[in-house]
C-alpha cells in the first residue's frame, strides 16, 4: 500500500480550507483517510498552517510520500528540514500579529471626550439663527 500525505479540500466555494491527511494513494482526493495530521487555511493573512510535527515525522519515517503542495507547507513549518536533517528546522512560518485590547477610560465613563463631534455644537447654534429671521418676518407682516 503506497501512502501519501496530501491535502483534502474542505470549506465553501471561493473559501478553500484544507486538511493535511495521510491517505492511500489509490483513494479519491476527499475519500477515506488514515489520519489527519494538520490544517491549512490559505485565505487568512498570513496563511494559517498547523501540522502535528511528531505525526508528520512518523509518517515520513515509515515511507509516506508528500504531495508537492504538502512538501511546500512542510518546508515552511520546518518539518521537511527536520526529517532530512537540514539546517533551518525552525521554519519560516509567520505568526499573525495580536490585536490590541480596548482600554477603558480611567474615570469609568463610557463616553470618550474625543468622540464628541463639533456637529452637535453647530446644530445648537443653527436653530437660534433660524428663529431670528422668523421673528423679523412676523414684524414685517404687521
From Swiss-Prot:
Residues 88-142 are annotated as: Disordered. GO terms for cellular component: cytoplasm; small ribosomal subunit. Keywords: Ribonucleoprotein, Ribosomal protein. Residues 126-142 have a biased composition (Acidic residues). GO terms for biological process: translation. Pfam families: Ribosomal_S16 (PF00886). GO terms for molecular function: structural constituent of ribosome. HAMAP family: Ribosomal_bS16 (MF_00385). PANTHER family: 30S RIBOSOMAL PROTEIN S16, SMALL RIBOSOMAL SUBUNIT PROTEIN BS16M. Belongs to the bacterial ribosomal protein bS16 family. This is Small ribosomal subunit protein bS16. It comes from Kocuria rhizophila (strain ATCC 9341 / DSM 348 / NBRC 103217 / DC2201).
Amino acid at each position: 500500500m503506497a501512502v501519501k500525505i496530501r491535502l483534502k479540500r474542505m470549506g465553501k466555494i471561493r473559501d478553500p480550507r484544507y486538511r493535511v491527511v495521510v491517505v492511500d494513494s489509490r483513494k479519491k482526493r476527499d475519500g477515506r483517510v488514515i489520519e489527519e495530521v494538520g490544517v491549512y487555511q490559505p485565505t487568512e493573512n498570513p496563511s494559517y498552517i498547523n501540522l502535528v510535527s511528531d505525526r508528520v515525522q512518523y509518517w515520513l519515517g515509515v515511507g509516506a510520500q508528500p504531495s508537492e503542495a504538502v512538501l511546500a507547507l512542510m518546508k515552511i513549518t520546518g518539518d521537511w528540514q527536520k526529517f532530512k536533517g537540514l539546517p533551518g528546522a525552525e521554519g519560516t512560518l509567520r505568526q499573525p500579529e495580536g490585536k490590541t485590547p480596548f482600554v477603558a477610560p480611567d474615570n469609568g465613563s463610557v463616553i470618550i471626550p474625543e468622540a464628541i463631534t463639533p456637529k452637535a455644537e453647530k446644530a445648537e447654534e443653527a436653530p437660534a439663527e433660524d428663529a431670528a429671521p422668523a421673528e423679523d418676518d412676523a414684524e414685517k407682516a404687521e
